[in-house]
Amino acid sequence: MTGKLIWLMGPSGSGKDSLLAELRLREQTQLLVAHRYITRDASAGSENHIALSEQEFFTRAGQNLLALSWHANGLYYGVGVEIDLWLHAGFDVLVNGSRAHLPQARARYQSALLPICLQVSPEILRQRLENRGRENASEINARLVRAARYTPQDCHTLNNDGSLCQSVDTLLTLIHQKEKHHACL
């Protein structure tokens, strides 16, 4: 593989969807943002995803059309094998990944994987979760506990407390630094 798979992770409310949406607006000739296949309605949530029924999801998984897949929060998530074609063509591919399923991504993509974990201060995370209005107070507290408890090992961290523009710039800098390092090996 000549491209890098950027596995972007972070707790709910950390700003992954906003970061990806902003990144899609910028011209990137060698960076593609992959859509996830999810068993939820297309209009649910803020993520730009491809909605599948469970039957459609299992059919695709059974036909080996998903490079990676997992179950979380009562839904099935997957990333299509098209990302492998993009990587082999030399593109870097950014995926909205799962912290719990990072080992699966590491096993498949090994040295081509660039894991990045968004970090957000508890105060900012609480504010974002409250503002989006999807969870009640006890669910927000549970998400805050889960966010504080789990940060994957051996990941690059990206603080997302600041402006969206600043976070995208920092993400792109991190990706390009890793490309230069990879090219020098």
Swiss-Prot record:
InterPro entries linked: GK/Ca_channel_bsu (IPR008145), P-loop_NTPase (IPR027417), PhnN (IPR012699)
UniProt key word Amino-acid biosynthesis: no
Pathways per UniProt: Metabolic intermediate biosynthesis; 5-phospho-alpha-D-ribose 1-diphosphate biosynthesis; 5-phospho-alpha-D-ribose 1-diphosphate from D-ribose 5-phosphate (route II): step 3/3
Biological process (GO), any one: organic phosphonate metabolic process
Reactions the enzyme catalyzes: alpha-D-ribose 1,5-bisphosphate + ATP = 5-phospho-alpha-D-ribose 1-diphosphate + ADP
Enzyme Commission code(s) on record: 2.7.4.23
GO MF terms held by the record: ATP binding; ribose 1,5-bisphosphate phosphokinase activity
The keyword Transmembrane helix appears for this protein: no
Residue sites binding ATP per the record: G10, P11, S12, G13, S14, G15, K16, D17
Keywords attached to this entry: ATP-binding, Nucleotide-binding, Transferase
Family statement: Belongs to the ribose 1,5-bisphosphokinase family.
Function according to Swiss-Prot or TrEMBL: Catalyzes the phosphorylation of ribose 1,5-bisphosphate to 5-phospho-D-ribosyl alpha-1-diphosphate (PRPP).
Entry-linked HAMAP family: PhnN
Protein name: Ribose 1,5-bisphosphate phosphokinase PhnN
Organism: Shigella dysenteriae serotype 1 (strain Sd197)
Phylogenetic classification of the source organism: Bacteria, Pseudomonadati, Pseudomonadota, Gammaproteobacteria, Enterobacterales
Gene it is expressed from: phnN
